[in-house]
Amino acid sequence: MTGMVYLIGAGPGDVKLITVKGRECIEKADVIVYDYLADAHLLEWARPDAELIYAGKQCKDHTMHQWEINELLVQKGKEGKIVARLKGGDPLVFGRGGEEAMALGEAGVPFEFVPGVTSPIAAPAYRSEEHTS
């Protein structure tokens, strides 16, 4: 039985900027693999029995290497788990979401991107600046 992996963008830092779909994925996940840049308050929406795995990376301080994260996502997906891969910002903007998707696709594990609000859009909006003027 194969599960499902959601590659979720948590937005630019304000927990209220995560998408409704992102929150729904967190709420139903069996496993949440989260990054350093994803606000820990988002984990409050996790089920009490959800497995929480920190996979944060900072400059020269990696809890897990990217290949280990890829393997973990594949493993949990193949175990039939619903996995929320929670990343700061958007998974496809410097989030290595493409690499994770490639590993999942090659392993035959279904996945879906859940885009996040990106900081290039959110930051000017907080300053009441138009993007297209």
Where does each model-flagged region fall?
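Short gly/pro/ser/thr-enriched loop/turn and capping motifs at secondary-structure boundaries
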Residues: 40-41, 59-61, 118-122
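Alpha-helical segments flanking ligand/cofactor-binding loops in enzyme cores
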Residues: 23-24, 74, 102
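Class I SAM-dependent methyltransferase SAM-binding "motif I" and its flanking Rossmann-like core
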Residues: 88-133
